[in-house]
């Protein structure tokens, strides 16, 4: 998918880019795979903001995407490649030979008419899903499970991929997009290939309004707030932070403080951290 560059006919158009959507084959989603999506605007069940900078935006339907890929040995044909407003990757509508329809994340190179299949005996071909233990070393994969049968949780964003490095007993070594090397059970499934729509990260929104269409509200600096709104607020003019270190709006240290639980059980499965050289 290419990048479309606009002429600077207005201030909002200057530097604006967008995807050309050349891979998209239809603009009409499969109705049976849509569910209503209520806008939460970052609020929890008490009506309190739990995630800042969310609200507004275009109304969306949620597409039911199959992350489990557990329909073994039943072939499916790719019918369409579609835009999904709820994620950075595109999705593909597949029709199984037994009549079932499903959405999957569209990997790079997947085309309409292509046949895909899931299961331990599946070929190492883009779009096929199989257990990690059955995937050869060096293969690029995405949509990786962390627990067998729970569905893919890792490597689902546009352009993302992980690589199989080897095996160690019942575990398989996988290098993630961040550089972290992690052991994952060999019975966990993954899909072969790189997630498509890899140009997504190169898009320049160009104006504030496009962020609002996406449901993203402005991010205001703490230093321009009042003291009752943020620890950095108050003072005359451009005042410094006034504390030992920068703080979050709730008074906790920001910038550099490690937030990972030191007793996390999954530590033993991480062979190399993402920030290790």
From Swiss-Prot:
Name of the protein this chain belongs to: Large ribosomal subunit protein uL2
What segment(s) does the record annotate as region Disordered?
219-277
- HAMAP family of this UniProt entry? Ribosomal_uL2_B
Q: Which SMART domains match?
A: Ribosomal_L2, Ribosomal_L2_C
What's in the GO CC field? large ribosomal subunit
Source organism of the structure: Streptococcus pneumoniae (strain ATCC BAA-255 / R6)
Gene this chain is encoded by: rplB
Family annotation (InterPro entries): NA-bd_OB-fold, Rib_uL2_dom2, Ribosomal_uL2, Ribosomal_uL2_bac/org-type, Ribosomal_uL2_C, Ribosomal_uL2_CS, Ribosomal_uL2_dom3, Ribosomal_uL2_RNA-bd_dom
An example GO biological process term is: cytoplasmic translation
List compositional bias (Basic and acidic residues) regions by residue number: 264-277
Q: Can you tell which superkingdom this protein's organism belongs to?
A: Bacteria
Annotated keywords: Ribonucleoprotein, Ribosomal protein, RNA-binding, rRNA-binding
């Amino acid at each position: 998918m290419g990048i479309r560059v606009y002429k600077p006919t207005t201030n909002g158009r200057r530097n604006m880019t967008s995807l050309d959507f050349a891979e998209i084959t239809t603009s009409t989603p499969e109705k049976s795979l849509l569910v209503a999506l209520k806008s939460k605007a970052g609020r929890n069940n008490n009506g309190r903001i739990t995630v800042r900078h969310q609200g507004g935006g275009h109304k969306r339907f949620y597409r039911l995407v199959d992350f489990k890929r557990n329909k073994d040995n039943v072939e499916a044909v790719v019918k369409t490649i579609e835009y999904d407003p709820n994620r950075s990757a595109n999705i593909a509508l597949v029709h199984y030979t037994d009549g079932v329809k499903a959405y999957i994340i569209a990997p790079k190179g997947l085309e309409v008419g292509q046949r895909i299949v899931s299961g331990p005996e599946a070929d190492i071909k883009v779009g096929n899903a199989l257990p990690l233990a059955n995937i050869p070393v060096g293969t690029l994969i995405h949509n990786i499970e962390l627990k067998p049968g729970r569905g893919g949780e890792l490597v689902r964003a546009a352009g993302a991929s992980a690589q199989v490095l080897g095996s160690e007993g019942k575990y398989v070594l996988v290098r993630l997009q961040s550089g972290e090397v992690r052991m994952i059970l060999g019975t966990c499934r993954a899909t072969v290939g790189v997630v498509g729509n890899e140009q997504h990260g190169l898009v320049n929104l160009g104006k504030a309004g496009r962020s609002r269409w996406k449901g993203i509200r402005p991010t205001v600096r703490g230093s321009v707030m009042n003291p009752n709104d943020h620890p950095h607020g108050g003072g005359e003019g451009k005042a410094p932070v006034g504390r030992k270190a920068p703080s979050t709006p709730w008074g906790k240290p920001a910038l550099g403080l490690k937030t990972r639980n030191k007793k996390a059980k999954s530590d033993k499965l991480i062979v190399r951290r993402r920030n290790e050289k």
